[in-house]
């Protein structure tokens, strides 16, 4: 049996599933949902309709892109790899807020089952896609909704935190939503489902920015400009493989979010009154910042805000960019010196 599995390149390994597959999935997410979001946002802000259309198609391929990228990491044969596109679409759609996590779990099973039967029959072109797709879609129907429901429980903690005083609410919402953004679940979907706007939305934006900008800046030594942009306006989920290897690298941006959250709520009174989904997007395509600005404009039109002040702009820039960068970088320095963060712990394969 061991020899058969070895021949099929099926290796039951925490590294292969928890690091290689997870890291590849994050790249698939970037190459579809996140780049699509950036393209769509550019189109909306510049009034170029074709870019909005292009971005929409890119975002629509999210599940397929993640699944295929996982298949590449698992070294799947061609027919298995191509079949995973359908599996990813099913898992992502049925997984809801836990879509990326559902894609990861389901795709691993579907890929390994597909590899088991690959080249074992004379009608391989039928058997291999049939097994891969059936296993993946049936698993998606059975477990993806449960994974989505589990991911949505994060919303319960967020809603509890929103009922606290602004200081503690700022800390908890910022930290929880920021962590959700980096995990293979959808912070944007959670925020949209909770209609998270207002002061709590501002705290959520702060937490997401702390993760994205924090990782981008503290890993600049390893990843240079490519990593700065990929994480800073893309996603901090790219670091999940490295986080599994060394969870300590998550401390600087998470601590930064615990600081910027209450500053956003108590000092700058930063509110996100745009579309709720923007609360969970952070600096991805600058959607979070555009959401805050849109909220200001809407509030002025509704008569609940007199004007956009210099304090508003200062708060937005400090909370979303400057403070996360400075705090994460400063916290990471002693951690590097004491060996908690080692050389290349933050390195990305870009």
Regions found by a protein language model. Name each.
Residues 1-350:
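Pore-lining transmembrane helices
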């Amino acid at each position: 049996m061991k020899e058969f599995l070895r021949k099929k390149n099926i290796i039951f390994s925490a590294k292969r599933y928890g690091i290689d597959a997870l890291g590849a999935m994050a790249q698939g997410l970037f190459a579809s949902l996140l780049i699509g979001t950036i393209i769509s946002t550019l189109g909306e802000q510049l009034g170029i309709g074709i870019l909005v259309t292009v971005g929409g198609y890119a975002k629509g391929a999210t599940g397929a892109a993640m699944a295929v990228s996982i298949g590449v990491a698992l070294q799947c044969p061609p027919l298995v790899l191509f079949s995973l596109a359908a599996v990813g679409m099913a898992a992502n759609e049925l997984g809801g807020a836990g879509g990326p996590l559902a894609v990861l779990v389901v795709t691993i099973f579907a890929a390994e089952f597909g590899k088991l039967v690959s080249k074992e029959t004379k009608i391989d072109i039928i058997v291999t896609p049939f097994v891969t797709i059936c296993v993946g879609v049936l698993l998606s129907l059975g477990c993806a909704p449960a994974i989505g429901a589990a991911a949505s429980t994060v919303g319960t903690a967020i809603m509890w935190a929103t009922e606290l005083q602004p200081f503690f609410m700022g800390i908890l919402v910022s930290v929880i939503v920021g962590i959700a953004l980096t995990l293979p679940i959808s912070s944007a979907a959670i925020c949209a489902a909770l209609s998270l706007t207002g002061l709590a939305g501002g705290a959520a934006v702060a937490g997401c920015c702390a993760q994205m900008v924090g990782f981008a800046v503290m890993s600049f030594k390893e990843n240079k400009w490519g990593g700065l942009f990929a994480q800073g306006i893309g996603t901090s989920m790219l670091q999940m493989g490295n986080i599994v290897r060394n969870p300590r690298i998550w401390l600087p941006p998470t601590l930064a979010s615990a600081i910027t959250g209450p500053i956003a709520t108590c000092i700058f009174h930063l509110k996100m009154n745009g579309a709720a989904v923007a609360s969970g997007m952070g600096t991805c395509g600058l959607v979070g910042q555009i959401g805050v600005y849109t909220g200001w404009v809407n509030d002025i039109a509704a008569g609940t805000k007199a004007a956009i002040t210099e304090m508003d702009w200062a708060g937005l820039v400090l909370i979303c960019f400057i403070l996360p960068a400075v705090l994460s970088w400063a916290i990471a320095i002693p951690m590097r010196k004491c060996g908690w963060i080692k050389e290349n712990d933050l390195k990305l394969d870009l």
